[in-house]
Design a protein with these regions (language model features):
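Conserved aromatic anchor
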Residues: 81-92, 199-210
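Recognizes extended acidic, P/S/T-rich segments that occur
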Residues: 100-146, 218-249
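Extracellular fibronectin type III
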Residues: 158-177, 263-279
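Serine-esterase "nucleophile elbow" of acetyl-processing enzymes
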Residues: 266-326, 336-345
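Oxyanion-hole/transition-state-stabilizing segment in secreted/luminal serine hydrolases
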Residues: 302-305, 313, 331-370, 392-395
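Active-site segments of SGNH/GDSL-like serine hydrolases
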Residues: 352-356, 377-411
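Catalytic His-Asp segment of secreted/periplasmic serine-dependent ester chemistry enzymes
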Residues: 394-485
Length: 485
């Protein structure tokens, strides 16, 4: 799911520390304490029921409501023999389980799979599914207005444990007169001001049944307008998403489309529609965010940066462009500065990187040197740098989800780097999410590293609460730098 650029260590031992007590002592004299209190107060309004509905994996004992908004059909409004079925997304779901029935059972449990189901799958990682009905429904039933197929869906956690009941059975009427799904359906859409413009896009779509792989082509001109247009980049994947490893920016839009291939490498239908996105320095972005996957977006294992509820930038009260790249170490972020930041020349650059380096055992002095290098180059180019402290992590959850160990002394490493950050103009993001025993709680970050939607909302609200003060400090620092030249 995330770029595998991270350096690894060879041993793991989770150390329990009383970090909370240390943070409380620091808060007494913390210069952003007022902003923190304001931020916590405003969360009641900003988050409301979001925090109340936070769940641990499968801790709801199936009291959480089942998926809703399932695709509705009637004999008069049928779908094709290869339909796309959808339901309302659930930010707490990692995957979904779907069952199909050729007859409506008289008795069926909402908490257990049914032996009467003719087809069942758990390989559903989004709130949409292209059902291969012709593989498990008799031909004389398909298209029969008096004999619909039935289906239901439930949400599962990372371990495959149900945390919601199955939905009610929904009839699925079909018609031979409707075209089958013949191409992927694109879902990612970029270009908005609320963290919705990414220098490193993630392309996502609804996949076709029986597709073994996908090809994504990116163009500098619309291939539907100019059929001879050649792609500037071609990506391949076996999943219904792919992270672009290359930055894309221009005063003109970019275009992308996807097609499927079967197991023999033959095209499985047609190209998808063409979708465009614009990432332009000409749009005069005043605020940019530079960092790793925590800022790039995504979380809860299945959600990519294309799902903006998993981006803390999406919750900001001001426009910002996302220059972050998943998988970055602090060194990688520093190396990208001239290529990825200077073309946009934002007035303010929010910088949060180093978590991947420190948890892998990188020397703290090296991370601090990378941050200082970025900070100095900002000032030299008339950009106001704003460093961001690193939130806590949860090594056991990182190991469970990513099978990656964490440096034994990660807390000391994070504390040392955060101490450096607090000597400059900074946002104390480490204070944004409440910790438990010094670690990032599972209820805010399933994978122990990337805050989920509720955690990202907390981060955005905290930034909003301190932004006027931090912005003024950044202006003052820039003026002092200019006066000293």
């Amino acid at each position: 799911m995330y770029n595998e650029k991270r350096r690894k260590v060879t041993s793991m031992k989770i150390m329990k520390r009383r970090y909370e007590r240390k943070l409380r002592e620091k808060m007494k004299s913390h210069k952003h304490m007022t902003g923190l209190l304001i931020g916590l107060s405003c969360l009641i309004v900003v988050l409301g029921g979001l925090l109340l509905s936070t769940r641990h994996e499968a801790s709801s004992q199936l009291l959480t409501p089942p998926p809703a908004g399932l695709s509705a059909t009637t004999a008069e409004t049928p779908l094709s023999y290869s339909p796309i079925l959808t339901w309302q997304t659930d930010d707490e779901a990692v995957m979904y389980e779907i069952e199909f029935f050729t007859k409506k059972p008289e008795h069926i449990s909402s908490s257990k799979i049914s032996s009467q189901a003719v087809f069942r799958t758990r390989s559903v990682y989004q709130n949409a599914y292209n059902a291969p009905l012709e593989e498990f429904v008799e031909a004389d039933q398909l298209g029969n207005p008096n004999e619909p197929v039935y289906w239901r869906v439930r949400a599962l956690d990372f371990n495959g444990t149900p945390y919601t009941p199955f939905s009610e059975l929904v009839p699925l009427y079909t018609s031979p007169n409707l075209p089958r799904m013949n191409a992927p359906v694109l879902t990612a859409e970029y270009g908005g001001p609320k963290g919705e413009t990414l220098l490193y896009p993630v392309y996502t779509w609804i996949g076709q049944a029986n597709a073994a792989s996908y090809e994504v082509d990116i163009y500098a001109e619309n291939p539907e307008v100019n059929p001879d247009a050649a792609p500037i980049e071609t990506l391949t994947t076996t999943m219904a998403e792919i992270y672009d490893p290359e930055p894309h920016y221009s005063s003109e839009p970019f275009y992308w489309r996807v097609r499927s291939f079967d197991g023999e490498g033959q095209p499985l239908g047609d190209w998808s529609e063409v979708r465009s996105f614009r990432t332009s320095p000409d749009d005069n972005w005043q605020v940019a965010v530079l960092g790793d996957s925590i800022s790039h977006g995504g979380g809860h294992y299945s959600y990519s940066p294309a799902v903006f509820s998993f981006s803390w930038l999406h919750y900001l009260d001001f426009p910002s462009i996302n220059l972050s790249e998943s998988g970055d170490t602090s060194g990688m972020t520093a190396e990208r500065f001239e290529r990825d930041v200077l073309p946009f020349h934002p007035a303010y650059l929010i910088i949060m990187t180093g978590s991947n380096s420190l948890r892998a055992g990188e020397d703290t002095d090296a991370v601090i040197a990378d941050l200082e290098s970025i900070r100095q180059r900002c000032l030299e180019n008339g950009i106001r740098p704003i460093l961001v402290t690193l939130p806590a992590i949860h090594p056991a959850n990182i190991e469970h989800v990513f099978d990656e160990p964490t440096a034994d002394d990660w807390e000391d490493r994070f504390e040392a780097v955060n101490a450096y950050i607090r000597t400059h103009t900074y946002i104390d993001m480490a204070m944004a999410i409440p910790t438990k025993d010094g670690e990032l709680p599972t209820q805010y970050a399933l994978d122990g590293l990337h805050p989920d939607a509720n955690g990202k909302a907390l981060m955005g609200a905290y930034v909003n609460s301190v932004w006027p003060e931090v912005k003024a400090e950044a202006d003052e620092e820039m003026q002092e730098y200019l006066d000293a030249q």
